[in-house]
Amino acid sequence: MLKKRKTTVYALGQYLSMSAHKARRVIDQIRGRSYEETLMILELMPYRACYPIFKLVYSAAANASYNMDSNESNLVISKAEVSEGTIVKKLKPRARGRSFPIKRPTCHISIVVKDISLDEYIEVDFLDPLRWSKKLKSKKKYTAMAYHNMYSNGGVWDKK
């Protein structure tokens, strides 16, 4: 009996005090990238949402090295999503005994890190001129490691 090896770990940040829309702008830039490239991007981006996301990515990598004994150079951000949390409502005192409501949005961020060195190999058939001939009894099969969602984020986001 074969047991499937676990290749993904995750880190979850809940009730982070920022808008989900602003966090998604940063998350869309790191999805599908390698761990080291993600850390460089997050250090250089000038947004407030980068620091909590940086901490989550770092935590996910620490989980991967502790739970799976994986190397940081083999890690890829396979899934990163942001969902809206609760809205914290406060009252700000104003003039003449009045108050003004303040809505403070929160969000939940989950980051899934995958170790590509533990992935299964994908069989790739190279085109052989003798592949269709009946004389050839055994086909040559080459295996190459490939990661499907490596470059799926669609380019660099520009600020509007």
Swiss-Prot record:
InterPro entries: Ribosomal_uL22, Ribosomal_uL22_bac/chlpt-type, Ribosomal_uL22_bac/org-type, Ribosomal_uL22_CS, Ribosomal_uL22_sf. One of its GO terms (cellular component) is large ribosomal subunit. GO terms for molecular function: rRNA binding; structural constituent of ribosome. Its main location: plastid. Signal peptide: none annotated. Keywords: Chloroplast, Plastid, Ribonucleoprotein, Ribosomal protein, RNA-binding, rRNA-binding. It comes from the Eukaryota. The keyword Oxidoreductase does not apply. It is found in: Plastid, Chloroplast. One of its GO terms (biological process) is translation. NCBIfam families: rplV_bact. Belongs to the universal ribosomal protein uL22 family. This protein binds specifically to 23S rRNA. The globular domain of the protein is located near the polypeptide exit tunnel on the outside of the subunit, while an extended beta-hairpin is found that lines the wall of the exit tunnel in the center of the 70S ribosome. Part of the 50S ribosomal subunit. This is Large ribosomal subunit protein uL22c. It comes from Panax ginseng.
